[in-house]
C-alpha cells in the first residue's frame, strides 16, 4: 500500500533530502545519519539547537552493531524491547560512519529500532540509518498524524501512516553496571522495565547525550496551566477521568475511563486541537503520576514552563 511512497522516500534520503515518516511513538523528520549536510538540514528546518542530539533509527540490531558498542545490559534491554519505544544511548565504535553533528560531537548516540511496518520497510532498503527527531518545530508539540504537522513542514515529502499507536516519544535509557538510567521518560515505563528486570536499579537522570531535556519543550502556542482545580473564563480544558471540571469553550478528555494508555494516544492530538481553538489558554486536569502518567506529566511540566527572565 505504501510501497511507492517508501521508494520515493528512499530516493530523497539518498540525495540528502529529508522525509517525514511514521513510527509507533510520534512522526519523525529524518535524514541520512551518515551525511553531515542532511543533519545540518534537520537542525535548520526544525530551528533546533545543535546541543539537542538526534536519535538514530535502524532496521535491526546487526546494523547497530556495525556502528556501536553494546554491553550485556544493552543486549538484555534490546532483545526484550526492540523493536519498540526504547532508545539506548550507545558508544560509537571506531568503524562508525555516524555523523558527529547529530550528537554535538559527543561519542554517545541514541539508537532505536521502531515498531512500525512503514519505517522498518524504509530502513530495510537503506544502507544507512535515519537520524530523526520528532516532526515538529523546536519546542512545539510532537505530531502523531500528518494533520498535526506544522504548515512549515508540510512542504517536505511525507509518508502518511495514520495515527501513531502509542502517542508519546521513546524512552531514552543508558545502561549501568546495576541497571539503567532513564534520561528521558517515554512510552516504555519504569514499570515495564521492572516487570522484565526486577533486580535492575533504575534512576531518572538528565544528560546532554539525550534529547528532550530542555526546560521549555513539547509546548503548544497557547499558554498552558497544569494540575488545575478550576477553569478560567476563556480557557479550554484538557481533562482526564471523571470530575466536575468544565470549560465554557471546549472540553476534550484524554480518557474518561482514566486509562493512561488511551491518554497517551490522545495527548498530542488533543493538545493540538485545543491549541487551534479560539481561547486564551489551555487548562489541564491532574494526571496520576505513575506509569505513562509520569511521562505525560513530564511533557506537561515542560510545555507549561515560563522563563521569567
What residues fall within each predicted segment?
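Active-site-adjacent structural elements in enzyme catalytic cores
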Residues: 1-309
Amino acid at each position: 500500500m505504501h510501497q511507492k511512497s517508501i521508494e520515493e522516500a528512499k530516493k530523497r534520503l539518498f540525495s540528502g533530502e529529508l522525509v517525514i515518516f511514521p513510527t509507533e511513538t510520534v512522526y519523525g523528520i529524518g535524514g541520512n545519519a551518515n551525511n553531515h549536510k542532511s543533519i545540518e538540514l534537520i537542525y535548520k528546518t526544525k530551528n533546533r539547537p545543535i546541543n539537542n542530539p538526534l536519535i538514530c533509527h535502524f532496521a535491526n540490531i546487526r546494523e547497530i552493531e556495525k556502528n556501536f558498542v553494546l554491553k550485556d545490559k544493552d543486549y538484555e534491554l534490546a532483545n526484550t524491547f526492540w523493536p519498540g519505544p526504547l532508545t539506548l544511548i550507545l558508544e560509537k565504535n571506531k568503524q562508525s560512519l555516524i555523523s558527529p553533528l547529530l550528537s554535538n560531537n559527543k561519542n554517545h548516540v541514541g539508537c532505536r529500532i521502531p515498531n512500525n511496518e512503514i519505517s522498518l520497510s524504509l530502513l530495510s532498503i537503506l544502507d544507512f540509518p535515519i537520524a530523526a527527531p520528532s516532526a515538529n518545530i523546536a519546542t512545539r508539540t510532537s505530531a502523531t498524524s500528518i494533520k498535526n504537522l506544522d504548515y512549515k513542514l508540510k512542504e517536505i515529502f511525507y509518508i502518511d501512516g495514520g495515527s501513531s499507536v502509542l502517542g508519546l516519544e521513546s524512552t531514552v535509557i543508558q545502561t549501568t553496571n546495576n541497571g539503567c538510567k532513564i534520561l528521558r521518560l517515554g512510552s516504555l515505563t519504569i514499570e515495564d522495565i521492572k516487570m522484565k528486570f526486577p533486580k535492575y536499579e533504575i534512576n531518572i537522570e538528565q544528560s546532554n547525550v539525550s534529547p528532550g531535556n530542555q526546560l521549555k519543550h513539547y509546548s503548544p502556542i497557547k499558554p498552558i496551566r497544569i494540575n488545575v482545580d478550576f477553569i478560567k473564563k476563556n480557557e479550554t480544558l484538557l481533562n482526564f477521568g471523571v470530575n466536575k471540571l468544565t470549560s465554557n469553550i471546549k472540553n476534550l478528555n484524554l480518557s474518561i475511563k482514566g486509562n493512561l494508555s488511551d491518554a497517551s494516544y490522545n495527548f498530542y492530538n488533543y493538545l493540538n486541537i485545543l491549541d487551534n481553538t479560539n481561547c486564551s489558554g489551555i487548562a489541564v486536569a491532574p494526571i496520576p503520576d505513575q506509569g505513562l502518567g509520569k511521562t505525560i506529566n513530564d511533557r506537561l511540566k515542560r510545555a507549561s514552563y515560563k522563563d521569567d527572565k
